[in-house]
């Protein structure tokens, strides 16, 4: 699938769907499918995320789905958010705050009372603010007031900026 051959993509999708495929192979194929970012891969991974019972596998699927820019990813995560265990919620917060549109959906869900403000980590709020979008900033201010990073956190963030930019390119 790295070459983008349609036959290879179809075979990878078939293997991920097959319950007899080993967990390790399924994990590797999920990663490859997310790298290709095809519509078929998105539909498969979203479907599996919505139906998966295993928490570890759901986190793998959320991580894979993060590579897609499609708004349906944020919508699917928010739909399951209330029923997620803590570890999944933390992963979901990281992912939802990583993209501007998903951040806006997430903070609107908080504003609507669907998600408790107290459950959102400060790092998540700061990540949402980093998008510098007025609608997000207004809701952050409404629910958390003025948040600022510590000097140490700013230093870590500035050191990580080149790596973050590189990750966004992939």
List where the protein language model places each region.
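Long, ordered, helix-rich scaffold segments
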Residues: 1-170
